[in-house]
Structure formats: structure tokens, C-alpha cells
């Protein structure tokens, strides 16, 4: 068994070496040194938001480089232990060494997946918006189910989730919601979920419990402090303030602290009412607007590339990217990758990583 472990580890180390070659850790180390120089400048903290973004980027880069180096050291130590056990003919250690090998194998697979996140903003935090579509109250309930699913998914990954805006439905569910997801590669993973999600089930909102099809659209945007693709001019903005509303329209705050920003050239409207002050809501709304404008430009570029390949499809409600069947059978099927599972409840509880991984790997094959 020790000889088999040795051969298997060598295969894993070859995969690992190939991954490191794609990653260019030297470039990341150089960026770390550049950011450390900028971080030492006292004037950086005159703009706290920029300073915070820089420090987050620096921390993530250091963590990423440390992860790769630690994994390299683990494999080296494991190889030495296997070799020592082979020399001594001690098979009693085989079970423990095999367990460590499996752990290393899982870690390499995780690093391999992150290599697929090679987009310019994949390592950023994300804003995720959900909009109820066709289906009335059922669609609004479906949007609320998706909000719970993504919140649970983010929490499972150790991400931080902040509610930015929420518009509740008249009878049940939500009309729309926007959350901020903060953590390593939040946008890179979450962008796999952008598109139209379809639910087929027996409606709990009518006496006959007839079969109902509901739709909701999910948008995912990278959070960036600045991007060359985006320019926001003050004269292009209309900013309105209003009183934050809770369930049933009850006022939450004693002052008009909620903010609505309209980007006049594009018609994009962003609201934020979850922060404590009007100034904070305005700053958050501007961050969401910047992210929406960037995602709009990235989508335009992607559509142009798709047209050149003859693959363009309009993002219409008939072009759902995933269907969740609760009746007559239970199944979740992704129409982009054909990945599916019958464990619908687990998916709705946030276990969507297999769908995300299938999407990322399919994108690499297409490119």
C-alpha cells in the first residue's frame, strides 16, 4: 500500500507543479511588495475606502501565496514520511498517511478550481441582486427562496453577507433584494449564478394547489473601488432620499435616510436603505451603481465575443440557465452544463458549489 501511496502522491505533485506554473506566484509576490510600499504611505488613509480596499487586497494576496507555499510544504513532508515508512517496511502508518494524502488531494483540487477564476475581477467581493419575474406571488416567494439559498451558500464558504436593499412582496416573499458578499473570490464564484432561475412546483398560494412556473433573475456584479471601464459623472446622477420602509410600509427610521440613485444615461436605479445614515446609504448606493455599470460593460464585451463566435443568446426569461423541479419529480438541472441533482433541498439550503464548479470548468473548455 505504501508504494501505491507514493505513486499517487507523485501524480498529485505533478498536478500541483503544473498549477503553480499557471499561477505565477512571483508576480503575486511582486504585487504584495508594491502594495506594502503604498500601505506605508500615511496619506493613503486620507481616503479610508481606498485604504481599506488596498489592505484587503494585500491580505488576500498574502493568504493566497501562503496557502500555496504551505501546501507545497505539506506534500514534501508527506513524501518524506512515505519514503521513511517504505524504508522501514512499516505498513502500520499506511492508514494515517492515506488520510493525509486524501486531505492534500482535496486541497489541490480546491486550488485547481481557483485557477479557473482568472478573470480581472474574479478575486473581488460581489454584489448579488435578485429580481422576481413572472409568476406573481409565487415568483416573489421564489425570489425569497433564492435569497436564502445564496445567503446560506455564502455562509457555508465563510463569506460575510450584508443586506443592502430589500423590497418585500405584498402577500409573501420579496420583489427584489441586493446583498453584498465579501470574501476571497466571491465574485469569481458567484458570477456563475447570474441568469434566469425557473421554479416548477405546486403553488402554495392558491386553493387548488395547481402547478405553477415562476421566474427570478439573478445579477452578480464585482465590487470595485475604481475601474477604467466605468466613469460616473456627477451630472449624470439623480439622487433622491426617502424614508426607509419595513414590512407593511412601516417607517423604520425617524429621518429620511434611504437613498435612491438614478444613472440618467443608462436608466439604472439603485437604492440603499440598510445603513444607519443617509451618507452611508449614499456611499453604498454609489458602490452598487459602479458595480452595475462595470458588469454592464463586461456583459457587453462578453456578448460581442459571443456574436463573433455565433453563440449569442438574448438574456430573456425564456432563456433560463437553471430549472428547479419540485413537481412532479424533484430535480435541479443546469441548462448550460447539463449538471443535475435530485437533492433539491440540499441545493436550496446552499449546496450549489457543484453547479458553480461545473460552470467554471465548462467555461475553460469553451475558451
From Swiss-Prot:
GO terms for molecular function: translation release factor activity, codon specific. PROSITE patterns: RF_PROK_I. Gene3D superfamilies: 3.30.160.20, 3.30.70.1660, Release factor (1.20.58.410). GO terms for cellular component: cytoplasm. Coiled coil: none annotated. The keyword Transmembrane does not apply. It is found in: Cytoplasm. Methylated by PrmC. Methylation increases the termination efficiency of RF2. The keyword Protein biosynthesis applies. Keywords: Cytoplasm, Methylation, Protein biosynthesis. InterPro entries: PCRF (IPR005139), Pep_chain_release_fac_I (IPR000352), Pep_chain_release_fac_I_sf (IPR045853), PrfB (IPR004374). The modification N5-methylglutamine is found at residue 250. Belongs to the prokaryotic/mitochondrial release factor family. Peptide chain release factor 2 directs the termination of translation in response to the peptide chain termination codons UGA and UAA. This is Peptide chain release factor 2. It comes from Chloroflexus aggregans (strain MD-66 / DSM 9485). The lineage of its organism: Bacteria, Bacillati, Chloroflexota, Chloroflexia, Chloroflexales. The gene is prfB.
